[in-house]
Swiss-Prot record:
SUPFAM superfamilies: Nucleic acid-binding proteins. Its main location: cytoplasm. Induction: In response to low temperature. The lineage of its organism: Bacteria, Pseudomonadati, Pseudomonadota, Gammaproteobacteria, Enterobacterales. Residues 1-46 form the CSD domain. Keywords: Activator, Cytoplasm, DNA-binding, Stress response, Transcription, Transcription regulation. Transmembrane segments: none annotated. The gene is cspA. The keyword GTP-binding does not apply. One of its GO terms (cellular component) is cytosol. This is Major cold shock protein. Homodimer. It is found in: Cytoplasm. One of its GO terms (molecular function) is DNA binding.
Length: 46
């Protein structure tokens, strides 16, 4: 409900920030805690 969160990579590396606008989905752009996802890291403006 915040519109953002963090993904914890399986390899134990640093958590990755994710914003809902970056989620590619045919339905609601939401992620659930514990859900496995595929992702590509991109640098964005901060």
């Amino acid at each position: 409900s915040k519109g953002f969160g963090f993904i914890s990579p399986k390899d134990g590396s640093k958590d990755v920030f994710v914003h809902f606008s970056a989620i590619q989905s045919d339905s609601f752009k939401t992620l659930n805690e514990g859900q496995e996802v595929s992702f590509t890291i991109e640098n964005g403006a901060k």
